[in-house]
C-alpha cells in the first residue's frame, strides 16, 4: 500500500532547484582556456561611436562578443541567465504623453564546469511614443549590456582589454583591411543553390575473364600525343568546303617489346637513312603519330605480292622521310629535278624462316574528313580499327568552292604562265648559246663595194632589239645558257624582255637603240642623176646604190650621207660659215633633198 504522501512524489516540484551535471575541465583544458583568455583583441573586433563632448567611445558589438565566447568556450561550453530585472523609473509627459524609462538587469554567465560570473547592465529610453516600444528597447539594451559585462570578467579576449588605455591608444592606430565577401560560405536554401554539372569521365571497361589477360594498351606517350593533336586541331571550321584531313592513329595490338617499323628499316638500310633528311608527310602536318610495330618479313611478303608497276608507283609516291627497301627502285636514275645523289642498292630483306609464325596483316586505315570522323563510333576510334567507307573517305583532289580560281588554268599542276594567262610550254634544256650578231661596220678593202648591212637586217639576224655591237660585260656569254636547276623557268624569266643572246641583258642597253626618222619622199628630179628614175617620169624610184653613195662621198670630202632608203639618218643643213660649201656639195650629190632646219 502506498504510504502517506507518495502521491505527491510523481510530480516534480517546480520550486526545487534541479540537480546539475558538472563536467570538470582537465588541467590541459584549463591551461588552454587560460592562454586564450589572456590574449588581447585585434582592431577588427573593436567598434567606435561618438560619446559625450565629442569624444570617441570604443566598444565591442554584441554579435562579436558572442562569437568570441563560442570560439573560446565552444557553442555548448557556456550559458547565460537573467537573475534580476528591475524597472528604475517610468515617466510619462502629461502633454505629449511620451515615456522615459530606465531598467537594470543582472546577468549570470555559467561555464560547463559550474564557474559563473554576474554583472549589471542598464538600459534606458527617452521620449518614446508607446510603453511597449519603451520596455522592449530598454530591456534589450540592459540585457545585452549585462551579458557583455559578465563575459569580460573571464579575460582580455572577451572585452576586458578595452579598458586598457595604452593598449587602446596603439590598437586604434592600426589599419584594418576590408574583408572580402565570400559567397561560398553562405548557408543557402536547397532551392536556391546553383547546381553545377559534375563532369565525370565514364570509362567503358569490357568484361575480362578471370584467367584472361587484358590487351596491352599503348605507351603513356600515346596519350600525350593525343593531347597534342587536340591542341593543334582546328575546331572552328566552316560548314561548307572541305576541312583538313585527320589521321587516325592505329591501335597497338602487339607487345611493347617489339621493335617499331623505323628501327627495323634503319637496320636494313642504314646508308639510305643517313643520306635522306627527316621529313613529314603533307597530310599529317606536325602531328606526331606512332606507327604500329611490325615484323620485317611482313613488309617483304607484301612487296613480293605486289606487281612491279605497283611497287614502282608506290616508291615514287613515298615521301623522303620513309626508307625504301625495294632494290629495283634504287637502280633507277633519279629525276633531274631531285637534288639527291643516287642511292646504293639496299640489301634485300632475309626470307622468313620456315615454321615462323606470320602475323596477320593489319586492317586498312584510310583518311577521313573532319565531318566524317564525328560520325564514326567512339569504340572504333578508341581501338583504331577504322576501315575507309565510301562517302566518308577523304578526297584530296576535291575542289573547294570557297577558293577563287582563274578559269582556263589547270590548278592541279604547277606550270609557268605567260602574261596573257595561258600556259607556256617548258623551255628546252638543250638550248645553245646564240652567236653575236654581225657588226654594221665593214672593213675597207675587198668588201667595200658590197652593200653594207642595214640596222633592220642586224635586228633580224640577232633576234634582239638592242643595239648592235660586241657583247658588253664579262657575263654576256652566260646569258644564252639554260637554267640547269629549273629549266622550265627559263622562259618565265624572259617574259616581257627581248632576247639577249650574245648581248648584255641589262635593261639600259635598250635605251640607246636606233629608230629611223620618218620623212616625206620628195618628187623625183628630172635629169641624169643617181636618184632619177630610169624613164624620167618618176614612176618608180630606185634605191641608192653603194657606188652612188661612194661618188657622193668623194665629192663632199668623204663624208657621205646615208640614204633614207637604207634607214640612215638624213643630216641637217649646215647653218655655219661653210653653208655655201655644204650647198655645193649637196648639189653635186644625187638623192633626196636633205631636211632643212626651220627658221623662225
Curated annotation (Swiss-Prot):
Keywords noted in UniProt = DNA damage, DNA recombination, DNA repair, DNA-binding, Nucleus
Q: What is this protein called?
A: DNA repair and recombination protein mus-11
An individual GO BP term: mitotic recombination
Q: Does the keyword Protein transport apply?
A: no
- Quote one Gene Ontology molecular function term: DNA binding
The record's subcellular location field reads: Nucleus
InterPro entries referenced in this protein's UniProt entry, alphabetically: DNA_recomb/repair_Rad52, Rad52_fam, Rad52_Rad59_Rad22, Rad52_Rad59_Rad22_sf
Q: Which family does it belong to?
A: Belongs to the RAD52 family.
Q: Where is the composition biased (Low complexity)?
A: 325-343, 458-470, 540-564, 577-591
Naming one, the record's GO cellular component terms include: nucleus
Highest rank taxon of the organism: Eukaryota
Tell me, in one coarse class, where this protein mainly resides: nucleus
The protein's matches in NCBIfam families, at most eight in alphabetical order, are given as:
rad52
Task: List compositional bias (Polar residues) regions by residue number.
Answer: 268-319, 502-512
Q: Which residues bind DNA?
A: 148-152
A Pfam cross-reference name: Rad52_Rad22
Q: Which organism is it from?
A: Neurospora crassa (strain ATCC 24698 / 74-OR23-1A / CBS 708.71 / DSM 1257 / FGSC 987)
Q: What is the lineage of its organism?
A: Eukaryota, Fungi, Dikarya, Ascomycota, Pezizomycotina
Q: What is said about its interaction partners and assembly?
A: Part of a complex that includes mei-3/rad51 and mus-11/rad52.
Locate the region Disordered: 268-357, 387-600
